[in-house]
């Protein structure tokens, strides 16, 4: 398996520290608002990575944090006249539900910042003891970037004072403009945490380093984790600062491999709530099936920036429809999992830095061949079983085609209408059983009046939205 390492800027063969086992940490959401498509893209990329690692026989321990300490959360709580916990619980729950609709599995470990304060205090103390941090007269604790000879080697940035002043909070008590807060002393606000350094709140960069040390780091390991992932916008300063903290507080580096997914853009602009052009995931899910969004957001290589537009989304749906139409042709077929050339080739392609474009091309070719075979030898059970086995592998490794094919084509029909159609189908089945064909035809017309197609199969009658 090969992964493009963002730190080394090359594609490298993936070799975990412990044979057969992989530790993965991904920066999760700050839960002060609804998830947008950028959050979805990142979560999907690393969900796919876990699936591919598992398919290659690795046992994966996947951690993705929840940032529930942040100034934005405090501001939102004040705006809504709610407690911090009420705000973070609400948006965390919403995030989980929306990710589930995209077919994203929950991580093995999901640490919260509020549950990791002791680990943060320990990390800050180590940095102070190692002379990589200092305390100001105001009670703040800063990381001393000048003490770390490897600072900026992850992001490969050049010392640029103007850039650092733009991206890193300024303070007259900092020794260097690039120094960043490990602990922010706060005396005039109620949302503070007691610590050995006084009342205050942890720095954002500190949270992730501490949670990795607490949950994933192992004694005598060269790296705290095998793979560290996140959005490309986190490379600097967040991941740069994380790496510096871990390197200077412990006897190991933070990650053996770094993976970063590209931005999601709308009309060519980087998606960001601060720019006001964010497309909330919950709004997209009202219009499109979650699996369609999954297919669309994964349809370009994870490192490429993604330009979200409805024309491409409609095209993605048509490509996913092909999977379900083949699955529908095979409905009722039973099979045993078996090795096929297609599965081998698909896994090899995805194992090459998650090469999704080539993978989707393979899937299209397989669907075309399967349909041609079914057209000419439709009763050949072995061919049907092979096609269904291939579809099952696509479902497992990519999360495409997970639904009943008839239910997939019912998206957009409300539950009340679905219930009414189900009742009519049941009545029609009874009429056909009693050979009341006039009633059966009348009931069929009533069903079709809902704007659906009705299909009679050996397994029963099914319908789909036109």
UniProtKB/Swiss-Prot annotation:
CDD domains named in the record: CysRS_core
Cellular component aspect of the GO annotation: cytosol
Coiled coil feature spans: none
Cofactor comment text: Binds 1 zinc ion per subunit.
Binding-site positions, ATP: 273
EC number: 6.1.1.16
First-listed, main subcellular location of the protein, grouped into a coarse class: cytoplasm
Binding site residues for Zn(2+): 27, 208, 238, 242
Top-rank taxon, per record: Bacteria
Cofactors named for this entry: Zn(2+)
Motif 'KMSKS' region: where in chain: 270-274
GO annotation, biological process: cysteinyl-tRNA aminoacylation
Compartments in which it is found: Cytoplasm
SUPFAM superfamilies: Anticodon-binding domain of a subclass of class I aminoacyl-tRNA synthetases, Nucleotidylyl transferase
Main enzyme class: ligase
Catalytic activity line of the entry: tRNA(Cys) + L-cysteine + ATP = L-cysteinyl-tRNA(Cys) + AMP + diphosphate
Positions of short motif 'HIGH' region: 29-39
Subunit description: Monomer.
Protein family per UniProt: Belongs to the class-I aminoacyl-tRNA synthetase family.
Classification via NCBIfam families: cysS
Name under which the protein is recorded: Cysteine--tRNA ligase
Organism: Sulfurimonas denitrificans (strain ATCC 33889 / DSM 1251) (Thiomicrospira denitrificans (strain ATCC 33889 / DSM 1251))
Gene that produces this protein: cysS
């Amino acid at each position: 398996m090969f992964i493009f390492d963002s730190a080394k800027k090359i594609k490298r063969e993936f070799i975990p520290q412990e044979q057969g086992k992989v530790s993965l940490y991904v920066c999760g959401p700050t839960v002060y608002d609804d998830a947008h498509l950028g959050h979805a893209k990142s979560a999907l990329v690393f969900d796919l990575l876990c699936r591919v690692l598992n398919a290659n026989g690795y046992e994966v321990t996947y951690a993705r944090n929840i940032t529930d300490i942040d100034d934005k959360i405090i501001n939102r709580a004040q705006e809504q006249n709610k407690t911090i916990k009420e705000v973070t619980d609400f948006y965390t729950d919403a995030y989980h539900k929306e990710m589930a609709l995209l077919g994203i599995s929950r991580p093995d470990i999901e640490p919260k910042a509020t549950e990791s304060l002791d680990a943060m205090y320990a990390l800050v103390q180590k940095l102070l003891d190692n002379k990589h941090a200092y305390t100001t007269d105001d009670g703040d604790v800063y990381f001393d970037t000048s003490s770390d000879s490897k600072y900026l080697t992850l992001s490969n940035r050049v010392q640029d004072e103007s850039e650092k002043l733009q991206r890193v909070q300024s303070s007259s008590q900092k020794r260097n403009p690039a120094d960043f807060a490990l602990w922010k002393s706060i005396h005039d606000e109620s949302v503070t945490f007691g610590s050995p350094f006084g009342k205050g709140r942890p720095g954002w960069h500190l949270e992730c380093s501490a949670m990795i040390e607490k949950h994933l780091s192992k004694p005598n390991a060269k790296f705290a984790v095998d793979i560290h992932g996140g959005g490309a916008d986190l490379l600097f300063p967040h991941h740069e600062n994380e790496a510096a903290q871990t390197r200077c507080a412990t006897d190991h580096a933070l990650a053996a491999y770094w993976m970063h997914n590209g931005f999601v853009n709308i009309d060519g602009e980087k998606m960001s709530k601060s720019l006001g052009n964010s497309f909330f995931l919950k709004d997209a899910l009202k219009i499109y099936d979650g699996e369609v969004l999954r297919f669309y957001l994964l349809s370009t290589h994870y490192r490429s920036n993604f330009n979200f537009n409805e024309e491409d989304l409609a095209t993605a749906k048509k490509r996913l429809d092909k999977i379900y139409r083949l699955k529908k042709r095979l409905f009722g077929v039973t099979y045993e999992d078996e090795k096929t050339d297609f599965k081998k080739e698909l896994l090899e392609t995805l194992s090459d830095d998650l090469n999704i474009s080539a993978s989707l091309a393979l899937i299209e070719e397989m669907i075309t061949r399967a349909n041609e075979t079914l057209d000419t030898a439709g009763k050949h059970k072995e061919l049907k079983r092979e096609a269904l086995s291939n579809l099952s592998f696509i479902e497992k490794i990519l999360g495409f085609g997970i639904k009943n094919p008839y239910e997939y084509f019912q998206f957009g029909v409300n539950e009340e209408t679905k219930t009414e159609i189900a009742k009519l189908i049941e009545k029609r089945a009874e009429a056909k059983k009693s050979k009341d064909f006039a009633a059966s035809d009348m009931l069929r017309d009533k069903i079709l009046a809902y704007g659906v197609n009705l299909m009679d199969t050996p397994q029963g009658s099914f319908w789909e939205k036109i």
